[in-house]
Amino acid sequence: HVFQNMGDGTYYHSGSLAIRAAVAAKTPVTFKILYNDAVAMTGGQAMDGPLSPTIIARQLAAEGVQRVVLLSEEPERHSESDLPAGATLLHRDALDSVQRELREVEGVTAIVFDQTCAAEKRRRRKRGLMPDPQRRVFINEAVCEGCGDCGTQSNCLSVTPVETELGRKRAIDQSSCNKDFSCLKGFCPSFVTVEGGRLKKPKAVEAL
């Protein structure tokens, strides 16, 4: 069974034709359509046309895709009545279990994953177009035992290894952290959340 990633821009441009061909060939494949609300390959522009996760789900069902699952970081923004018959609406945390389920299905299945692109989210926050959570996450190095469960749960690049005298531990790279907070799902008492705090700006380097 094959899992194939596809962005929403690619789907809108020509990717739907590949899905149609896979359905005709009865290929055992799951298309993971990433609805990230921006055309990443050309600079983060908005989609040039009417498209939404529920529209994609209905199109996939109309093309003959056997199972369609819509995963979202905010499932409450969608209504199951807007989905085609047989489609499922779940929180993004169910991704692993959904993939394990769909790999057992013969033929074409699809996951529509609805989450704004991390880079686009950061860009909008800087421009005041999206709320910026006034919370930051830190890891207490003295408590961390380096188990790595925070990285396993979040799969986040901002959870970085730190070499200490007591071995490798973990830290949050604040410069790249996108405030997704998935790392807090790690089974660990070392996390500290700070409300309303701001990062200290580094001192300017004097010119030589």
For every predicted segment, state its role.
Residues 17, 24, 51-55, 63, ...:
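Conserved active-site and cofactor/substrate-binding residues in soluble primary-metabolism enzymes
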Residues 6-9, 15, 34-36, 72-74, ...:
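Fold-independent oxyanion-binding glycine-rich loops
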Residues 38-129:
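Glycine-rich ThDP/TPP pyrophosphate-binding loop and its adjacent helix/strand module
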